[in-house]
């Protein structure tokens, strides 16, 4: 088989996405089937993606050819919390380009989604994977799988040199790298290596297609969009996080119990994360801000509620690599269970190659603005500054200045 990092088709199937898109999609089907949403793509570092417009459009059109095979549906059917009516819906589901607008605006690539949440929700991950791989095909056409493979083995060597055997036995790592992967073939290759040779515990992948293909566990619960949408779906803004968690609990009855804390801020989240939720959810996910300070805050919260932190799990997923994961693991070992979801550093780390820095985020729900503030100054995402100000006011979040970038 060719050692080229690229294949003809970028997105392999409807399952070539993050698992949490499917878990949220089922909850949307059952609770909000007619809600409209809007999303916008943003390249964070100003890279010129205009030359790739036509090819990106072509790849988006190819998405419409995808449907779930009986084998795909049989795989999902084995997951206990995937309901029969959702499986029937997925069997009929097709991507529809009427909900996608891809243009050049102000000399930048612009991708906007607008349509029913139920029909738009699956676009995010494949669209980002398409932009990344199209760009990489043009910029780095001669890249070989061996370059990515050798880089990963170098990381394994570093880990076995710096971690003890006991530490490695407890270090749990998962792949969260679909959306910014260098290419599909690189992610597939990396997962095979991780499954067979990772010196710690490799616990699975967020990619459902590759989980099925490589007999791995598909991982994921909810994303920021779930909590953001409830800013316009709940009865009052102040109750939006509670509404999001309540709806999740009704849908999954204690399963899929890792909650994301930083949609507004972790402090604002923990104010709503009372004894009921703290007992019911298995743990929390970190996605911005200082990871150890965040963990200390979570441990303290559990202790105040009379819950043993060792009965809970913290999942870390913010720009991780193996050295960072090992540092966090050591800081928290024996105090609370930890697991690490590593993305770009596994699926797009090739010597001499700069990975994409991009996002595709929900900007409106039910015709009104939604926002993510996060625990990191400068990571706020919203088109409407007035709504952000209102959100900060309601949740008593101070407006911190963004850190200045060096000249």
Curated annotation (Swiss-Prot):
The modification Phosphohistidine is found at residue 224. SUPFAM superfamilies: Nicotinate/Quinolinate PRTase C-terminal domain-like (SSF51690), Nicotinate/Quinolinate PRTase N-terminal domain-like (SSF54675). It is an enzyme of class 6 (ligase). This is Nicotinate phosphoribosyltransferase. InterPro entries: N/Namide_PRibTrfase, NAPRTase_N, Nic_PRibTrfase, Nic_PRibTrfase-Fam, Nicotinate_pribotase-like_C. The gene is pncB. Catalyzes the synthesis of beta-nicotinate D-ribonucleotide from nicotinate and 5-phospho-D-ribose 1-phosphate at the expense of ATP. Transiently phosphorylated on a His residue during the reaction cycle. Phosphorylation strongly increases the affinity for substrates and increases the rate of nicotinate D-ribonucleotide production. Dephosphorylation regenerates the low-affinity form of the enzyme, leading to product release. GO terms for biological process: NAD biosynthetic process via the salvage pathway. The keyword Thylakoid does not apply. Keywords: Ligase, Phosphoprotein, Pyridine nucleotide biosynthesis. Belongs to the NAPRTase family.
